[in-house]
Amino acid sequence: MAHVTEYTCSGCGLELVNDGRAFVWNEETDMTEDFLILMSTCQKFYGAEIIGNVSETYCSECERYVKVYSITEVLGSIDDACDVVMRGIENHIREHGRKLSKLKDIRKRSQYSISEEDGHYVVRIPEFESFYYSNYLFPEMSKEEVIEDALNDFHEEIGGLIESYEKRHQRYLDSHYLVVDNTGRPKDEFDISEKVRCPECGSEINKHVDGQLPCPRCGGRIFGLGIFYD
């Protein structure tokens, strides 16, 4: 279960997230993938050659978000781990953009198949394998009504997914990236007031976001709302 805290500044409205994300890099994909630590995502650690965590902060000089990738483990003979992770971040952002474009194309085409199974209609979207629609509970629906209802459901489902992808992709594009090597640091060591340098302008900024710390943009007070994800 992941605990995500969404912070909002009471003064300037800046929004920041502390979600305890992890990241992995492996040679096969050459991508640095960040994710919430859940039961469903733990398998991502297997086969990873570089492991670490991600924190989000903000540079008031650049007026940009800064994502800090802290390397905690290097499993294998990789000398330039920081450069490798940075290259993997760039590859991951490009791949995320391609997936977003593909989802938009799938929505645009809206190709479907309809079949009769056990006396009711079933509609599937071949390019969107998770979608399944059946009129099992409403057998009186005509074939045309089933298709119309299924496509409405499909557009609602894929539309929500696209919106989520767009929001995340824009955050990727709006951020600077910093990779630091923490492999020599004890895993349980954590300093909420730790500072880092903005990779763009060199300004000293907080590495973490927390309700105990002032807003990194205006110095005002930030308030957090905690959410749990299974």
Which stretches of residues belong to each language-model region?
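Short metal-coordination and nucleic-acid-contact micro-motifs, chiefly zinc-binding Cys/His arrays
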Residues: 2-5, 52-55, 191-194, 211
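Short linear proline/tyrosine/threonine-rich motifs used for host-factor recruitment
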Residues: 114, 121-125
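Cys/His-clustered metal-coordination modules, chiefly Zn-binding fingers
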Residues: 165-167, 172-230
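Short recognition patches in nucleic-acid-associated and regulatory proteins
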Residues: 11-56, 68-90, 182-184, 197-206, ...
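His-enriched metal-coordination microenvironments in redox/metal-binding proteins
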Residues: 1-6, 228-230
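A short, exposed loop/beta-hairpin motif centered on an aromatic-Gly-Thr core
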Residues: 130-149, 206
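Short cysteine-rich clusters marking metal-coordination/redox-active sites
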Residues: 9-12, 59-62, 101, 115-116, ...
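Cysteine-rich micro-motifs
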Residues: 32, 52-64, 211-221
